[in-house]
Amino acid sequence: MIVDQLGTRERADDVERSARIRWDGGDFRLFVSTPRRVAAPSGDASGFVCALLLLAMRVGEDLEVRSSVSRRLLERVPRIVDLYATWDPRLHRSRVRAEQELEPRGAAAGVGCFLSRGVDSMHSVAVPRGLPGALTELVHCDRLEPKHSVAVRAEEIRLAREAARELGLPLVVIDTNLRELTDPIVADWADMVGGGLAFLAHAMAGGLGHVVIPSSAAPTTVIPTGSSPMLDAMFSSDELEIYHDAPATRPAKVAWLVRERAELLPYLKVCFHEDRSDNCGRCPKCLTTMLSLEAAGALRLATAFPPELDRSALAELAVQGIQPREEFREIEWRLRERGADELAGLVAGALARGAAGPPDGELPTDSPAFLARAERDAMRALASQPRSRGAGP
């Protein structure tokens, strides 16, 4: 896979950086557009390495960058390759060559965090932190969700601006065609997300020297997935430090938002099941979030969700996977603490149906399936253990 013909195009207040990407059977021009005030200097192709490394491993090619790349990032590439290949042994162990290594030039002072309005990002943009310090910018990326129509994309930006206003922080809106390149090669964005967000972060290194990636993992479920505390920070350079935020369960994040920043609840949007800027209320992500809100006594404050839980959808849900099961167990005890035993019983039923399901299954061939592989193997191990009498799901 070859990266060449880096280009810069300036339009009004925006700067677009792009490069031609070529591989056996494919050719694509990848771009990212950012406001001028945060745009990275031209000639630095470090971000393209972050975006393309997993793709090169998937197509079985080495990565040749005919431009300059951060020395620090190049030194960490073998470790990133080791992680990816350990998580999916089908991957080619790609080598990366750059035309030139960049000398350190110093980092900008800005501190940013991605904002999609999901539970993870809403918690990350609101919670106080010591390192890397208080946020100075929030970042919303247009076109990162392929399902979204033009009208929904515009509404997503409007709502992200309103949420940023509640937080008293400026919103940086950026744009990219990254998913048009990655989806045909790595079909599951969850496998790609750490490298993809690092690509976007590097494009803003002219104004942001530190960027936080919201954590989707819980403290006890830091397992292989495309965005991980084991992985994300290794995409850093001397000019840009990338932080994977502190892990916490989603029910705990929701409870914190209810306690500390309830004014943000109307902006929560977790649903990617449909082309909409609010939430369907029926998909697993919606049900998990609505149950977490109900357990905190605040579902009606989150006005982008239906006001009532869809009990028929919950009655059909079978919760599998290490992290979903941990979060549903937490939701169950939080509901019981509030005296919501009937709803807690429905949650327990979803856990029981998931435990009764087979741990085996065919892994997809259109993506590395890091998380699915790890959870399948973990569920197999649990299923092989002898169960004591009276053991729960």
Give, region by region, the residue ranges found by the protein language model:
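Short Lys/Arg-enriched alpha/beta "domain-start" segment
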Residues: 1-16, 27-29, 33, 39-44
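Solvent-exposed strand-loop boundary residues in beta-sheet-rich modules
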Residues: 23-25
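Extended acidic/polar, glycine-enriched regions
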Residues: 38, 44-53, 66
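Nucleotide-activated chemistry modules centered on ATP-dependent adenylation/adenylyltransferase
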Residues: 1-20, 51, 56-63, 69-114, ...
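N-terminal targeting/anchoring "stem" of glycan-biosynthesis enzymes
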Residues: 265-266, 376-390
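Short glycine-rich, basic-tinged beta-strand/loop micro-motifs
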Residues: 28-34, 60, 65
